[in-house]
Amino acid sequence: PEMCIRDSYNPYTTMVGGDWYFAPVVRHTGAVYLNDRQLYEAETLEECIKGEVYAPSWEPEWSVYKWYTEQDKEKNQTVIYANFQGKNPTEEKVEINVRRNCFMPSKTGVNYITFSGFDVSKAATTWAPPAAYQDGMIGPHWSKGWIIEDCEVSNSKCCGISLGKYYDPENDHYFTRKHVKSPTQMERDAVCRGQYHGWTKENIGSHIIRRCHIHHCEQTGIVGRMGGVFSIIEDNHIHNINNMQQLGGAEISGIKMHAAIDVVMRRNHIHHCTMGIWCDWEAQGTRLTQNLLHDNCPPEGTPKAEGAMMSQDIFIEVGHGPTLIDNNIMLSPVSVR
């Protein structure tokens, strides 16, 4: 069927990729869904038709459901093919994503919003590394004092909820686009440049994410870089993050936070994610307490996908602390790294 995309963002021509993305850049931000489950993107029409198992998947039986897209340049149309494995798409629930975000202000500084009780699903979010604009299906976009509560958040192509970084045109995927310096230097620059863009306790952070059910997103359940300082993340159920293994890189976890300064993460239940909680850079005054983490590892015998990272319940990286990890139950093969 033909589809009309009314703005400049076409997820079926936009690729997932950027700084700290280690997998091949062959997946689109678009996706096809069958009965609320994302299909696996094929690189060719032949692969789509064959519908073979994708071995790195954590759910190989689901990986035979495929889709493929190409552009008809003569008609200026996006064409999508799908292999539903014999299911009739006119009788099943079949959807595609189009929106880049669902509830996220286009401007920064939109403070003190409460977002409560919504079911948010199926957005064409983009890869969200730390030295880039970090979008999600929901997010305050460099603001202060949001409450995101009692929501179901699922099936984002990349991130579910973003407490992340603003768009800085002079430091956005700069290594990928300009091929200078390094992604690590871009992160150092982001810390310094943030001071010129209002990164103070008076302006940014102090958010609350609570009692949300976050699942089946392919980069993170919750992501953040600098914008999540002084926040509380509590009583959330986060699971099945990055189980398709079609995306790979250094920004994948149930919760992935850079600069989780004075952030408390408590009483969260996190399982079946590539990683449970990853605090990267500046985990200063961070406390992880009373969380239940388990099965944050691939099924036994599953081959590693290209670009995939190691798995563990909690990972603290590039942080001089102090970071307090107390009263958690960690049952995965690797607990803390």
Regions found by a protein language model. Give the residues of each.
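Right-handed parallel beta-helix
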Residues: N111-A124, K144-C158, E170-A190, K201-Q219, ...
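Extracellular polysaccharide-degrading/modifying enzymes targeting complex plant/algal/animal polysaccharides
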Residues: P1-E2, R6-W142, I147, E152-S154, ...
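Beta-rich catalytic cores
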Residues: Q134, E218, E251, M310
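Predominantly extracellular/luminal carbohydrate-interaction, adhesion, and secreted-enzyme modules
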Residues: G136-I138, T220, S253-M257
